[in-house]
């Protein structure tokens, strides 16, 4: 009874939010529903085969790829509704998850993005069939706290779900530690471009030694497991000699790793590997990320990065033939107000490309670029920064609120 009341209240709140022009209303609907019935997430998850996706970077992309791959199992129902419940907007905390499940109540499958800190209690509520563990590294310094504490919390949370299949990235030391003792693990070599936060063993505190792609702890029986899935430049290798083509619309080595884990998750639920890989390859844009827009006659591609590991990966995606690169950094609360992480990022030299430091913290960024030996100019407003670049292709790399605000300005026509 309380659950039905919560759902009706959520529907009314969402409608009112849309009417008032305050977005799609899903978050406010989820918040109100949980206030009325805190057990609603558990109720909505019953009867669904659910995949949870978590990690510091790549959650939204991998969730979108997983949803596409799971769609090959069920298609749509007679009313044309998706067979997979998932978030469209990356809202990965309780209210957003409830909103996604509410919007797809009849779906037999779910691909749910979950914030790392929320994974244990979300798993307790939804009893997932599969959990995808992507990577674990420092996020904003003033948000997530000590990374080894997070690893221990996730390890304890997963121990409560021995029947769940963990799709774990064996190239990430901290993720491996989370899954190492679990009885049902599928290991994927998805890559790890960031090892700064895993130089010591999370179990013994002793050093981690790297020998090529293999790693091991000097102080405990803890080493890189042998992967069942491995991603290549254009192929995906799986169990029993399986090798299938992997052609992605999204750029970068990290996205190939994301696709590998998404495919492995879908296969764990019975999907055909080749069909799952083809479906994952159709994902092109996630909440504005990777999209290309025209701004003042310049073809502008939008990239988002939120922490040192994400910045390092995004910088590797920059097209060296671009005529301009705008790097926009804000320092608002959602970004993390401590920008000392800028000094952990290895900024490249972009010969022949005009680099522009932008955003509310453009001056801090400019200092870092100067010490990195990157020639640049400073134009605080991101739209003006794009306009300052020579005509042609411009790459924009921005942190969370800078990316959000620039997208909003583009949607309102400020850059037309």
Task: Tell where the protein language model's regions lie, with residue ranges.
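ATP-dependent carboxylate-amine ligase
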Residues: 1-30, 46, 267-272, 278-416
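Phosphate-binding loop of NTP-binding sites
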Residues: 2-187
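Buried hydrophobic packing segments
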Residues: 66, 70, 97-101, 259-269, ...
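Short, acidic/turn-prone active-site loops that include or flank metal/cofactor-
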Residues: 89-92, 135-139, 190-194, 330-332, ...
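Short, surface-exposed amphipathic charged segments that create phosphate/polyanion-binding patches used
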Residues: 101, 147-148, 197-208, 387-395
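Short hydrophobic/aromatic-enriched beta-strand-loop microsegments
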Residues: 110, 130-136, 184-191, 325-327, ...
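Residue-level signal for inorganic ion chemistry
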Residues: 134, 167, 204, 258, ...
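Adenine nucleotide phosphate-binding catalytic loops in nucleotide-utilizing enzymes
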Residues: 184-308
């Amino acid at each position: 009874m309380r659950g039905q009341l919560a759902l009706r209240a959520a529907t009314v709140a969402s409608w009112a939010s849309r009417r008032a022009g305050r977005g799609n209303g899903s978050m406010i609907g989820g918040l109100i529903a949980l206030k009325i019935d805190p057990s609603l997430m558990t109720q909505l998850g019953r009867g669904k085969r659910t995949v949870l996706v978590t990690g510091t970077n790549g959650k939204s992309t991998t969730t979108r790829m997983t949803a596409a791959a799971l769609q090959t199992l069920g298609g749509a129902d007679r009313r044309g509704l998706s067979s997979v419940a998932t978030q469209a907007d990356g809202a990965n905390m309780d209210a957003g998850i409830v909103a996604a499940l509410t919007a797809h109540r009849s779906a037999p499958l779910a691909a749910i993005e979950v914030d790392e800190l929320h994974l244990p209690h979300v798993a307790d509520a939804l009893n997932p069939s599969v959990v995808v563990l992507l990577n674990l590294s420092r996020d904003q310094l003033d948000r997530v706290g000590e990374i080894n504490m997070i690893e221990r919390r996730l390890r304890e949370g997963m121990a409560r779900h021995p029947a769940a299949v963990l799709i774990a990235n064996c190239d990430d030391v901290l993720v491996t530690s989370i899954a190492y003792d679990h009885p049902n693990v599928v290991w994927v070599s998805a890559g790890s471009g960031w090892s700064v936060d895993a130089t010591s063993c999370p179990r013994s505190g002793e050093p981690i030694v790297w020998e090529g792609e293999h790693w091991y702890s000097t102080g405990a029986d803890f080493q890189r497991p042998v992967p069942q899935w491995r991603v290549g430049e254009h192929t995906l290798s799986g169990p029993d000699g399986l090798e299938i083509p992997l052609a992605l619309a999204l750029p970068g080595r990290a996205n190939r790793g994301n696709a590998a884990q998404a495919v492995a998750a879908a296969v764990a639920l019975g999907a055909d590997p080749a069909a799952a890989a083809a479906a994952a390859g159709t994902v092109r844009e996630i909440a504005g990320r990777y999209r290309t827009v025209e701004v003042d006659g310049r073809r502008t591609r939008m990239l988002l990065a939120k922490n040192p590991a994400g910045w390092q990966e995004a910088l590797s995606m920059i097209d060296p033939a671009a005529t301009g690169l705008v790097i926009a950094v804000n320092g608002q609360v959602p970004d993390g107000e401590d920008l000392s992480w800028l000094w952990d990022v290895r900024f490249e030299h972009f010969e022949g490309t005009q680099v522009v430091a932008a955003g509310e913290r453009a001056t801090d960024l400019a200092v870092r670029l100067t010490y990195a030996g990157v020639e640049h100019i400073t134009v605080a407003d991101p739209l003006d920064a794009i306009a300052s670049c020579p005509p042609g292709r411009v790459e924009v790399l921005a942190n969370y609120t800078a990316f959000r605000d620039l997208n909003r300005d583009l949607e309102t026509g400020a850059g037309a």
